[in-house]
Amino acid sequence: MSIQVKNIEKHFGAFHALKNISLDFPEGQLVALLGPSGCGKTTLLRIIAGLESADEGKILLEGADATNIHVRERQVGFVFQHYALFRHMSVFDNIAFGLRVRPRSTRPSEAEIKKRVTRLLDLVQLGFLADRYPSQLSGGQRQRIALARALAVEPRVLLLDEPFGALDAKVRKELRRWLRTLHDELHITSIFVTHDQEEALEVADQIIVMNKGNVEQIGSPREVYEKPATPFVFDFLGQANRFDGQYHENKVELGEDQIILPNVSEVPHGKVIAFARPDELHIHAQPQDNTIQATFLREVWIAGKVVAELQDRNGRLIEIALSPDEARLHLFRPNQTVWISVSQLHLFADHVA
């Protein structure tokens, strides 16, 4: 089912939560609403579900106006961050619940319910837990059961609000892979809310980056990461070193340092915001042309990766990615003067300045 959001406005008192939001969610895609807390992503999801009403605008489901249709009639499956399973019911009964409370005219027979629940338990790979209770399950297992319960009523769209936010890092990673595989099998239109950039980049077909009630960028994971449209998107997606400076005639002046770049025609001369990923910067023990002078602070070893922390002459903290071999080869010392070269510098006009 395709979903269209047209000119949605939402206020909570004086707080403007959503500002004229218009979006298309293609049928069969897994779309991430990505942004920091308070950006409006969960509010938008709840409006699509029918759990919240908009001040202005429309929600179209399969081209039909669903703005004033009750949540029960939208055929939406919803999965929350906190599993919301019924503690007094078995896993089987939790999944069957939505089917058993239907009006008699649309309620399946018990034989059909058993068949459907068994199929869903197999789908989420937890058939052996059918007779257990939520308190006997791990967090990851509970979330799979919550997803199976949402799918039991055969929704036309699946909405997930930070579905893995309450789980530890390893379980989150496992469930991300599982969700992507499950979606490829079912091809149900799905929207999930997350503030986790890695989660969105790994799972989604399309990412909608939100900030302060606005949409900053829409694109594939590769597009939003490699070609961020705004400084916010660049800074929010992945690690980034930010520099504020002046751009003029192929030179970026960064306080006491300057970097010469190839012609950057799309950026006007004047104040700019410049970004470089940690793997786009390189450390040198000896002075080099076209470099930034800095002081080496320390190395941080994380899961086979090395991050060098430095401070430039303007007091900015800079992070540079090193391979373990590079770190062992150079053996930089705290407070050592080093020089930083830049393989790529991404410039944005500083409209605020």
UniProtKB/Swiss-Prot annotation:
Enzyme Commission identifier(s): 7.3.2.3
Biological role stated in the UniProt entry: Part of the ABC transporter complex CysAWTP involved in sulfate/thiosulfate import. Responsible for energy coupling to the transport system.
Protein name per the record: Sulfate/thiosulfate import ATP-binding protein CysA
Main location: membrane
Any one GO cellular component localisation term in the record: ATP-binding cassette (ABC) transporter complex
Binding site for ATP: 35-42
Native species: Acinetobacter baylyi (strain ATCC 33305 / BD413 / ADP1)
Matching SMART domains: AAA
